[in-house]
Regions:
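Periplasmic polypeptide-binding modules associated with outer-membrane biogenesis and secretion
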Residues: 1-195
Length: 195
């Protein structure tokens, strides 16, 4: 458990040993010797697969950074499992917001380069570029459509453009805002996406 905890903090090359010392009063002391070593740094970040974007663009999306001499204060250059999970989510969101509805970002792999550094590889399958063909707002008959003109305009702007999760989320938030301001109790904003 100690080793796992150290790895989560970026000490992949740490060494933990234990020893037991027997005392005169029928008790024992358990002694853990921990050599942290250096924190593991990311020397190279690469992206493979059908990514459709340059590596430089994708590096600007993720939080993990390559170790460079001018980044001596940055904590983002260290290999960290939580950051890797965040990076995968950020890459997925980036692709979803750029029209790649079926994107998959496969688990990143870290390859040991030397005593304290790794090469980090993200495998991306962007899939096809999706555009929005048509949009439609279905309202109950007792709702005034004039209350939803802004939503209609936002929906119309989507048509013919690349699919964007952020833009769709903004529309749902606008519907929620209208329902709160107009005190509509039973609005259920849902998006039906068809391929």
């Amino acid at each position: 458990n100690i080793k796992k905890s150290l790895i989560l903090q970026g000490y992949y090359f740490s060494n933990v040993t234990s020893s037991i010392k027997t005392n005169d009063n029928n008790t024992v002391n358990i002694i853990f010797n921990i050599d942290l070593g250096e924190k593991s740094k990311v020397s190279i970040i690469e992206f493979t697969g059908d990514k459709f974007f340059k590596d430089k663009t994708l590096r600007n999306i993720i939080t993990t950074e390559e170790n460079k001499f001018w980044k001596f204060l940055s904590g983002k250059k260290y290999l960290n499992q939580q950051n890797l999970s965040l990076d995968e989510r950020l890459l997925r969101q980036f692709y979803l917001n750029n029209g790649y509805y079926d994107v998959s970002v496969n688990t990143s792999t870290a390859t040991i380069l030397d005593d304290d550094s790794f090469k980090l590889t993200y495998n991306i399958n962007a899939g096809n570029l999706f555009t929005v063909n048509s949009t439609k707002l279905d309202l109950p008959i007792d709702y005034n459509p004039l209350n939803f003109t802004k939503v209609e305009k936002l929906l119309n702007k989507l048509e013919g453009n690349k699919y964007s999760f952020n833009k769709i989320s903004k529309i749902v938030k606008e519907i929620d805002r209208i329902s709160l301001s107009r005190e509509f109790d039973f609005i259920n904003a849902s998006i039906l996406e068809e391929k």
